[in-house]
Amino acid sequence: MCVFKPHLAVFDAQGQASESKAGDSEVYQREMYEPSGRLRSLLRLEPLRMIVYLTLLAIQSRTLDAGDWPMWRKDELRSAVTDEVLPETLSLLWRRDLPALTPAYRNARLHFDRGYEPVVLEKRLFVASSHNDSLTAMDTETGKVLWRLYAGGPIRFAPVVGDGKVWFGSDDGVVYCVNASDGKVLWTLRAVPSKRMLLGNGRLISVWPIRGGPVLRDGRLYFAAGVWSFEGVFVYCVEAESGKVIWRNDRAGYIYGKHPHNAEAFGGLTPQGYLVINGDDLIVPCGSALPATFDLKSGRLNDFSLPAPGRDPGGWFASVLRSEDGQNLRRGTLTLDSEVNQDRHEDRQIKNTGTPGARNSVRIQDKTIRFADGFRNVKGTIHSMLAADGKAFVVTLDGSIHCFGDSTAEPAIYERKKYEISKPESLPDGLKQALDHSGRNGFTAIVGNPSSPFLESFAGHTELHVLAFHTDETQCGKIRGQLDDLDLYGTRISVLHGDGSNLPPYIARLIYWTDGSPDQEACKTLFRSVRPYGGRLCFTAKNRPGINLGDLPGAELRHAAGFVSIVRAGALPGATDYLGDWAKSRDALVKAPLGVLWFDDTVGLFKRSPQPRILNGVMASHKKRWIEDFDKRAGGKDYRLTPAIYTDVYTGTVLGESDTEDVRKVLPKPDLEEVQPSQYRPPSQIDHWAPDAPQPGTRVNPLNGKEEPRRFPKSYGCDGGFDYGNLFTMRSGTAAFYDKTQESGTINISGPRSGCTNSVIPANGVLNIPYFYEGCTCSYPLPTALALVSMPQTFEQWASW
């Protein structure tokens, strides 16, 4: 029986829901979340209507000053329309070159953070950055930096400004309110259940990043936290002045309903995109799916559904066209952008409905300006444009902000500084030896209040991303600024407030304790985060207390030049490798409940690629040449393979040759010229496209105590599933698994698409779910790779049984 108390939705043989409760938790009926058609009724997307509506948008909302641009695309409708009066002759006043931003995802349907999105309040321009986790205020007249503030993670969405304040959210799970004049923090709200962290898009962030971009109306700020529905998502309304919570919806993560191809499974919101207010509706974009609609006043979920037919690509962008009569300034027609909501299916490019180019244009007075047409003498691809304070601001994808206004003076040009990497100061021999044994790709952590000079020197000796922990929050800000001045912050080094105790498990190739020697409890806590297969916890031998290795499974003690290393030399006890060929993988560490360890879409695989092999903490994957070989596919044969890509199963990091030598010697090398089969199926699956229902043995029914065949809900998925021994994994609408050791029921990992090939594999102590999405356009809301790790039994996880 599942001792971790999952919420259960019980189904009969026909898949019909019946009432059930787990503990005292209320079970909401499916009817509450059936698509109401409200969202569909809002989507009137004809391009001709857009032209008609845009002519009406010169009248601004009563709540906004025409001289400001207080939020992304001007207002809560995200209309990108202003009646700002610009000089007849526009001259370049200044240009500031910032680092180009790297979006969180490769997939353009999730490019909500591809470039800078400034906002303007009075004489100040504010720009957020995911490059160095900062919010910067600039003088609109001169382009000079007035102040800069650093958050605890990337800031991926534009701030909101008004009433002398700036509001923004970060991937650290915190919403900030600061003084617009000097950046002083007025209040913060940790909008998430705990300080638990994971690796998300290559950075250490909260499990619940703020990726529902904030929007403001009538003194209330709305935003959303969390991107994994099965981890919990939270949609908020707070008082802008104080941060006091007015309402919070935390029930939108576990919704049993339709998925692509009419599958039924647990799913829910994946808030990624800018929130929109349309009359009494709060629109919450959901990544590469379609948006959800909430009641603005109460926070009740009114509508959310995934496109059931499949092949209907959604995306992050949503905005509103105002009513045809121009009188209702707060309600209009929700519009999407068909250039955002498109993707390459295996056989063709597929576009969903929407207004082409809606995201890439603004309207100033009676003139629509399309970014593709260029602006003045701006070089590069225009990403964003706005008008405020009698000026036009143009932002390019390469990171340059241009300000145009009325002036004959020579423009001020602030070029990005080019930093010479100086030879780093030497490290102590014992620490240098430990670092030399820690590999080149991945993460290292430094705990114990390191200084900026030490971090600069340390980073000069390694290619690993450095995670530095400092217990003094004020010092964190200072060190971030000092490292940013050296162009090291964010991309090479992250400074986090804390003692390192909330580091995720297994991610660090080296953890260095700078403050003497850790006690037994600290060793135990930090050792959990040390990577298997050679990772180490390192500290000075001076005044070292006795270390009980019995508390540290698999640990070995090593000494070098005055330093001690506790090394996790081999595999995790109980973990298994998976070498393919449909062998069992009874990994004793992979058991329900499971939570996200990392997610990233750097490596994308074709949907019918072969299973990866997993050995010594490394996943070896082969893509198919589906684009290059498309015209050659015939007779049940498919495409050729590309060379193997090697990734770290504990971080998702792509690994080079020096970190994978042992694996390359062992794993087979397929013939890259051989045409591959269309499908890869286990011997138990006879029909490639219509698998039989899973029947992996018998069980004792936890509801009635009787022995019976082990059956459980499995919805659509040409992957019929595979019994790895302890876990049966499959695609059941989403990636899913059934833990046989606990009779867990079917647990959906909602968000990504698992492969046509079974690609949900327990091995090396984690549940591996590589990205098997290329060639598919269905609206799975979060197409990415991820790994999951076992969580405490108190962790909430819903299942269908």
Identify the residue ranges that each predicted region occupies.
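Extracellular/periplasmic ectodomains of large secreted or surface enzymes and adhesion receptors
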Residues: 1-58, 64-110, 191, 251-252, ...
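Repeat-blade elements of multi-bladed beta-propeller folds
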Residues: 1-3, 69-73, 109-135, 149-176, ...
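Beta-propeller blade signature
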Residues: 8-11, 183, 233-244, 293-299, ...
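A short beta-strand motif characteristic of beta-propeller blades
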Residues: 94, 100-107, 144-149, 187, ...
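Conserved SAM-binding motif I beta-strand of class I
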Residues: 465-470
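Conserved SAM-binding strand-loop segment of SAM-dependent methyltransferases
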Residues: 487-499
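A short acidic, Gly/Pro-enriched loop at the edge of an enzyme's catalytic core
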Residues: 501-510
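A short glycine-rich, Lys/Arg-flanked "PGG" loop and its adjoining helix->strand segment in the class I
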Residues: 520-535
